[in-house]
Design a protein with these regions (language model features):
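Beta-strand-rich recognition domains
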Residues: 1-21, 60-202, 208-226, 230-304
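Short, glycine/acidic-rich beta->alpha junctions
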Residues: 4, 37-41
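Exposed aromatic-hydrophobic patches
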Residues: 41-48
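A generic "functional-site adjacency" signal
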Residues: 48-49, 187
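Short, well-structured beta-strand segments within conserved domains
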Residues: 50-61
Length: 304
């Protein structure tokens, strides 16, 4: 049986050097590469962003600032792999995207110009009757450099809520009033969380994270309620830690960071990091919690 029909665990291996870039899965920036003067390597799980049929991966290299020159050594390598939750020792590579500043045409060094078929029941070997289809890359250099790839990989994961949610506006182009309307709506939800945490009432807010917690349990084959319990313990640890203090703020300190697919939006502070912040007392640093929202039928839902 194909591991895709069991309990697949998808991950991205990201290796980069002398470059700044976003890594994108299905219209969501799942990782930011900031290796502008050195190398980095990381592997991240992506089940909670994956679709059960068709998925899109991308590398978006930051555009150059005026007067800035890109190092000829700039590279990004992105590899999608899968393993079974029941047998994690065997990992299989499915698709790859690569960026090399030293070469002009990413299409030329990113594999075939025709779809490639892989067989998930035969160690993802290339076969004409394969059930996995890796499409050629698409390159867009209108703003920075974007290299994306479509992958048809039928699997047993459910359709996550954000795939079917309302399209969000382009927050970089809408009016100030429309932007403020959505920001204020998310701030009201944030404020409920902040007020509860300020008095240590963690149980009062866990239901706001119901979709996030439930879908995380499903994505990684956890027991029902495990992610909820983990979030509760993390909040309690922060609330009871005498070395950190909840940062309470009015709405002017916050903003919106939309995901490129316009299905999710992050509610962030002015430093572009997670909205819920516990600052260390007497020293720099903080403990942060992300708030990532979607909208369905007019209702804002914490999705991730």
């Amino acid at each position: 049986m194909s591991i895709l029909n069991g309990k697949p665990l998808f991950s991205l291996s990201i290796k980069a050097s002398d470059v700044r870039a976003f890594i994108e899965v299905n219209g969501i920036y799942v990782h930011t590469v900031n290796s502008s003067s050195g190398s980095s390597s990381v592997e991240i799980p992506v089940n909670h962003y994956f679709h059960p049929e068709t998925n899109y991966l991308g590398v978006v290299v930051f555009p150059l600032a005026e007067g800035e020159k890109r190092s000829a050594k700039s590279t990004v390598n992105l590899t999608l792999s899968v393993k079974s939750d029941e047998n994690p020792n065997n990992k299989y590579d499915i698709a790859e995207i690569e960026y090399r500043a030293s070469q002009d045409d990413p299409s030329g060094y990113n594999g075939s110009n025709s779809p490639v078929f892989l067989s998930s029941i035969d160690a993802f070997a290339e076969k004409d009757e394969g059930d996995v289809v890796v499409h050629p890359v698409v390159v867009d250099d209108s703003e920075g450099i974007s290299i994306s790839r479509k992958i048809e990989v039928p699997n047993s994961l459910p359709v996550w809520g954000f795939f079917e949610s309302d399209d969000l506006p382009d927050y970089f182009r809408i009016s100030k009033d429309d932007y403020a309307r959505d920001k204020d709506a998310l701030y009201e939800i944030y404020k409920v969380i902040e007020q509860s945490l300020s008095v240590g009432e963690v149980d009062e807010i866990l239901d706001l994270f119901e979709e996030r917690n439930r879908e995380t349990d499903q994505a990684f084959y956890l027991d029902q309620g495990e992610t909820r319990d983990s979030l509760k313990q993390s909040f309690l640890s922060s609330v009871n830690n005498e070395n950190i203090q909840l940062l309470e703020s009015d709405s002017i300190k916050f903003g919106l960071r939309p995901e490129p697919g316009r299905k999710l939006v992050r509610f962030i502070r002015a430093d572009r990091r997670g909205a819920i912040a516990f600052n260390f007392i007497g020293e720099e640093g903080s403990v942060r919690y992300d708030l990532v929202f979607r909208k369905q039928d007019g209702e804002w839902i914490i999705s991730r």
